[in-house]
Amino acid sequence: MLRQVLSSTSVRRLLVSPTRCMSGKQNVPDKIEYSTPPEIIDYEESPHLPVPEYPIRPDEPLETRKQRLLYQSRKRGMLENDLLLSTFVAKYLKDFDAEETAQYDQLINGVSNDWDIYYWATNTKPTPPEYDTDVMKLLKQHVKNTERVQRIRQPDL
């Protein structure tokens, strides 16, 4: 299939003559400068898309809960939180008691927006009182990375 596409005359002309690709564009800048936005833009929650409540699992054994939290910390769908939470869990979750494990479960599953967790952990936004627990304080300390540990990938399982 690729050979057929490459052998077509129109594709060959584009490959041989790259100026044809740019023929429609005038005043193309040599250098593009990017700037960071001055503030975080948060939109109000849409009333049309209700987020279901996370089911509370009171009878879940502690080891099963820790295994579930390990998985959920690694699979957030957001690379920043994947790295922060997976390294946090690898370091601290094994030593958590039932109360601390419940606090961590509430933190990562009670919030409907993962960006909130990220902003709270990095002290970009103030943490609401219901999530300002000992586990959150420990997470904030972990995010500061005072030991200068390299966190470019998730820890091995």
Swiss-Prot record:
Q: What are the boundaries of the transit peptide?
A: 1-21
**Which Cys-Cys disulfides exist here?**
none
Q: Which UniProt keywords apply?
A: Chaperone, Mitochondrion, Transit peptide
Superkingdom per UniProt: Eukaryota
Gene Ontology CC: one annotated term = mitochondrion
Q: Which locations, inside or outside the cell, does it occupy?
A: Mitochondrion matrix
Q: What is its main location?
A: mitochondrion
What is the role of this chain?
Plays an essential role in the assembly of succinate dehydrogenase (SDH), an enzyme complex (also referred to as respiratory complex II) that is a component of both the tricarboxylic acid (TCA) cycle and the mitochondrial electron transport chain, and which couples the oxidation of succinate to fumarate with the reduction of ubiquinone (coenzyme Q) to ubiquinol. Required for flavinylation (covalent attachment of FAD) of the flavoprotein subunit of the SDH catalytic dimer.
Similarity field: Belongs to the SDHAF2 family.
* Quaternary data: Interacts with the flavoprotein subunit within the SDH catalytic dimer.
In Swiss-Prot or TrEMBL terms, this protein is called Succinate dehydrogenase assembly factor 2-A, mitochondrial
- Print the organism lineage: Eukaryota, Metazoa, Ecdysozoa, Arthropoda, Hexapoda
